[in-house]
Amino acid sequence: MSGKIEYISGPVVKADLPGARLYELVFVGEIRLFGEVVRVQGDKAFIQVYEDTTGLKPGEPVERTGEPLSAWLGPTIIGKIYDGVQRPLKDIEEISKNPFIARGIGYDKAPPLDLKSEFDFRPAVKPGDEVSPGDVLGSVKETELMTHYILYPPLPEHAPGVVEWVAEGKYKVDDVIARIKTKRGVVEVKMWHKWPVRRPRPFREKLPPVEPLITGVRTVDTMFPIAKGGAAAVPGPFGSGKTVMIRTLSMFAQSRFIIPVLCGERGNEAADALQGLLKLKDPATGRPLLERTTIIVNTSNMPVAAREASVYMGTTLGEYFRDQGYDVLVLADSTSRWAEAMREVALRIGEMPSEEGYPAYLPTRLAEFYERAGRVVLMGSKERIGSLTIAASVSPPGGDFTEPVTSNTLRFIGAFWPLSPRLAYSRHYPAIDWLAAFSRYVDTVEVWWSKNVSPEWRKIRDSLQSLLVKEAELQEIVRILGTEALSEYEKHILNVAFMIREGFLKQDAYNPIDTPSAPIKQFLLMKAIYTYYEEGLKAIEAGVPASALRELDSVKRLPRLRMEVTNDAAKEQLTKFIETLVLEIREKVARKS
């Protein structure tokens, strides 16, 4: 089960390794560095090494494990900060006595789970019950915010059977908590199991994404919504607000469990993001957000190959919590760094480059990643539903959205939130370009908004979006001829579009009144602007100039409402404001006539 190194090229090692299998986990060299077989030619294996290869030399041993790179799934996973191959960074720091990650620290020294931790196990089944792979056998209370459900793992070797033994009590993570008698023999189930990171976890049926994932960001929730089980991309150049967007989503998105994957970002940016995440409180309970979060960190100064593993690792952890019946959100920042890692490894093992040097299978890998999102009926004998939502940032060089990663990503996502440097430099945040963004989930989430907020939601949303498009067309005329060339109706459109931008789309992520924005507040802010538009049209027909309408007290207050009205008071105060606005405009018309 071992071989020898033949040559080393950066993160790639070629070894004479008879019997090696694709994507098999191996240990490379005397210091046993993590590696994964990415190409096999006869008895020769090309290995991408997940640690720094400095000091390796030809002739050193390569040891096969016989199994693929796998995630360890079970209690003690919540609240941990892992590297790309699921080694706990805090444990590594204690072992190495150094803030920098020492090489050769394997799962034997720093296991992903604390297998000796004890939990009070409460069974959900009893002896004699029939169970299938994927069924919940019991639960442990891991944190104040999360109950960790223990599953009968849906591994290929597991079959339906009858519970032979299960008992309540205090157990270590590595203890057997149930025995299940199947046709293939008795299966001893522990609190944890392993799952290959590149293999999607099974489910019974994929459901349409019909419920919106409320994020508290108005531009996202109202204009370009994402559904639970959907996939979204946030492309943008340096300084356009991608990291703040990811932070806002991680804090306010109404998902039960959050997995931020910091993939290939700069070390100081990742450290800053981590410090911010560690300080965040859950808005609903005031408890630390870390009690419903697991973080994966793989900065740009860490070995390039581990970036690929970190994305798959985060998705696998997300699927595991989805299988417990939770709504899970995976936030990957950024997939461009992951693609760059793929490009480097592919070129080093001699694969034919495609567009801009990326491997020809880049679209396939992106599809594999985004297709793991979904709202599904889970495995097991009882019908349960869980969802995995993926939102990933993309960092196109120079903000060029035609480069391969961004252009291929567009094919596999349902929501596209491009960040505009022009908006970011003018201090308009979130800097989502409303003319380039889109969402394929508007039709599917419309029923939820109509039922839970207002039947008028779709009509008003579409009207505001069309006004923004008209504004862009009118701006061309204004640049050439000035506002004097516009009719009163067109001037009114520009005034309303200004209100949409300043009073609705703009949002201060650090203002507790402005962010998060509850669905009812979002709708009523939108309705207030729409009322100004509709009543204004009638006033203009009656001869009132657009400039006079803009000088009304209520209209002047419109852009400030988002920062004055809290979510709790939104229904009462905004409804009253809309009535006052209508009254003022109609009084203006009456005085004119």
From Swiss-Prot:
<dbReference type="InterPro" id="IPR024034">
    <property type="entry name" value="ATPase_F1/V1_b/a_C"/>
</dbReference>
<comment type="subunit">
    <text>Has multiple subunits with at least A(3), B(3), C, D, E, F, H, I and proteolipid K(x).</text>
</comment>
<protein>
    <recommendedName>
        <fullName>A-type ATP synthase subunit A</fullName>
        <ecNumber>7.1.2.2</ecNumber>
    </recommendedName>
</protein>
<dbReference type="InterPro" id="IPR055190">
    <property type="entry name" value="ATP-synt_VA_C"/>
</dbReference>
<dbReference type="InterPro" id="IPR036121">
    <property type="entry name" value="ATPase_F1/V1/A1_a/bsu_N_sf"/>
</dbReference>
<comment type="function">
    <text>Component of the A-type ATP synthase that produces ATP from ADP in the presence of a proton gradient across the membrane. The A chain is the catalytic subunit.</text>
</comment>
<feature type="binding site">
    <location>
        <begin position="236"/>
        <end position="243"/>
    </location>
    <ligand>
        <name>ATP</name>
    </ligand>
</feature>
<dbReference type="GO" id="GO:0005524">
    <property type="term" value="F:ATP binding"/>
</dbReference>
<keyword id="KW-0547">Nucleotide-binding</keyword>
<dbReference type="Pfam" id="PF00006">
    <property type="entry name" value="ATP-synt_ab"/>
</dbReference>
<keyword id="KW-0406">Ion transport</keyword>
<keyword id="KW-1003">Cell membrane</keyword>
<dbReference type="InterPro" id="IPR022878">
    <property type="entry name" value="V-ATPase_asu"/>
</dbReference>
<keyword id="KW-0067">ATP-binding</keyword>
<keyword id="KW-0066">ATP synthesis</keyword>
<dbReference type="GO" id="GO:0046961">
    <property type="term" value="F:proton-transporting ATPase activity, rotational mechanism"/>
</dbReference>
<keyword id="KW-1278">Translocase</keyword>
<comment type="similarity">
    <text>Belongs to the ATPase alpha/beta chains family.</text>
</comment>
<dbReference type="Pfam" id="PF02874">
    <property type="entry name" value="ATP-synt_ab_N"/>
</dbReference>
<dbReference type="GO" id="GO:0042777">
    <property type="term" value="P:proton motive force-driven plasma membrane ATP synthesis"/>
</dbReference>
<keyword id="KW-0375">Hydrogen ion transport</keyword>
<dbReference type="InterPro" id="IPR031686">
    <property type="entry name" value="ATP-synth_a_Xtn"/>
</dbReference>
<dbReference type="Pfam" id="PF22919">
    <property type="entry name" value="ATP-synt_VA_C"/>
</dbReference>
<dbReference type="InterPro" id="IPR000194">
    <property type="entry name" value="ATPase_F1/V1/A1_a/bsu_nucl-bd"/>
</dbReference>
<dbReference type="InterPro" id="IPR023366">
    <property type="entry name" value="ATP_synth_asu-like_sf"/>
</dbReference>
<dbReference type="InterPro" id="IPR004100">
    <property type="entry name" value="ATPase_F1/V1/A1_a/bsu_N"/>
</dbReference>
<dbReference type="InterPro" id="IPR027417">
    <property type="entry name" value="P-loop_NTPase"/>
</dbReference>
<dbReference type="GO" id="GO:0046933">
    <property type="term" value="F:proton-transporting ATP synthase activity, rotational mechanism"/>
</dbReference>
<keyword id="KW-0472">Membrane</keyword>
<dbReference type="GO" id="GO:0005886">
    <property type="term" value="C:plasma membrane"/>
</dbReference>
<keyword id="KW-0813">Transport</keyword>
<dbReference type="Pfam" id="PF16886">
    <property type="entry name" value="ATP-synt_ab_Xtn"/>
</dbReference>
